Amino acid sequence: MSLMNDPRPVSKKAGAKPVYGKNTPQFTKTVGEIVNALINAYKEGKKVNLLKIKTELAAKNSLSDQPKSVDIISAIPESYKNTLLPLLKAKPVRTASGIAVVAVMCKPHRCPHLAMTGNICVYCPGGPDSDFEYSTQSYTGYEPTSMRAIRARYNPFLQTRHRIDQLKRLGHNVEKVEFIIMGGTFMSLPSDYRDYFIRNLHDALSGHTSNNVAEAVKYSEQSNVKCVGITIETRPDHCLKLHLSNMLTYGCTRLEIGVQSVFEDIARDTNRGHTVRAVLESFQLAKDSGFKVVAHMMPDLPNMGMERDIYGFMEFFENPAFRADGLKIYPTLVIRGTGLYELWKTGTYKNYSPDSLVDLIAKVLALVPPWTRIYRIQRDIPMPLVTSGVEYGNLRELCLARMKDFGTKCRDVRTREVGIQEVHHKIKPDQVELIRRDYVANGGWETFLSFEDPKQDILIGLLRLRKCSETSFRPELKENCSIVRELHVYGSVVGIHNRDPTKFQHQGYGTLLMEEAERIAREEHGSIKLAVIAGVGTRHYYRKLGYELDGVYVSKYLG
């Protein structure tokens, strides 16, 4: 029995004061005293130093270790939970963007282009044939999401339930959930497995046992825990019309597409199994279907070099044929068992130095337009598994610090989000204005509407509006139509039926953005209909604004 779970007092030396672990009366007493101290501080309007309270009371009651936030949260009376949870919330950045992200993994399977090219990408770890054989393609099995998936034996229902319960115990509001389906190319799996997987994700939220995806979506729409979106990782060659239509029926609203490089020779040399031209076609098809598009890019690939890397990112941000809505930057890692590892061993390939990599990404972040969101700046592969490559676990932080040295600033969506600003810098917006930015991307006219505090450069909410192009293949979007691809109000999560004047959700920003989008669609686009790609759990919200279910979208005819 471990010290923490042993109810008996334990002392290392004879005559020493006894030390108590978990499951002892002393531990329970300490947790109760901490909760009482928090309640009293709240009643008296005092600021709380939680660490000091825990340290003092744990020492006073001779505990072997301080109580964790989970222990304290479980002891808070229901009447005080709304006021005290923000003080105890572990990792507040998890829900700072207004939603609780639940990452799940599909079962391990071989890469779809293996049959065509005879091999996987040179840098790719993981998969059934790799040194990490129980992992999914491009993962090692030691990432936090991978380990949760392996513990659940890749069961989607259990993965969802376990992660939601974990977030609840950490003090997060989980009424608005966004799924990210990871683990290789999900759309290359058999359709019956995909249906089983999606059905179980929705059933894990609603508690209903469904017979098919349509039934699961119907019950998920009425669930107390709302599925506000699903993100699917895919490749350009598995992002064609049939794939897109299937993903729309699943309730998918965002795609993560592996691009890795904007150069055809690099795509060929790294054995990607698709062309850059295929990337551009998939981007246009996806946006014309209403999806938000997030690209994966890899600096430091073989045969690139610093200047070519920077030029590649300039091309990505400035060329209208690319211009994704979001970006994940994954610097190249050398991992045992990959083709790149063999090149590294022979000296044919060498990574940038750690300082050079920080310089490169700092320069890239300065190029990011204000309508693009940088979701990640490095893989969460544990450092002991990395033979060569990124040597820091806090790469984003180091890059932002280097930008200060350069006198530049990152103005991407995530850096400016009100929730992130509040968590990291304790800054709140003062004067909020509606700001509009128009640009051309992927054969269409894009309008990026946002509520911002321009002086402090803080973003409260955004809307992405697109005039559907003539090449749109979805029947719902064939007539003269515009589509809202994203509506998001940031800040920490507020419950579906709750109001909190100190938060930014449910304060009317979303309605105002939709009204402006309707005006632009009617008066400037000349559209007769406005469609929205709405997450399954958000359809009720749009019904209140006069929208009705229209195939896989919700839409409204503009008078």
Curated annotation (Swiss-Prot):
Residues 94-384 form the Radical SAM core domain. Its cofactor is [4Fe-4S] cluster. Gene3D superfamilies: 3.40.630.30. GO terms for biological process: regulation of transcription by RNA polymerase II; tRNA wobble base 5-methoxycarbonylmethyl-2-thiouridinylation; tRNA wobble uridine modification. The keyword tRNA processing applies. Binds 1 [4Fe-4S] cluster. The cluster is coordinated with 3 cysteines and an exchangeable S-adenosyl-L-methionine. Component of the elongator complex. This is Elongator complex protein 3. It comes from Dictyostelium discoideum.
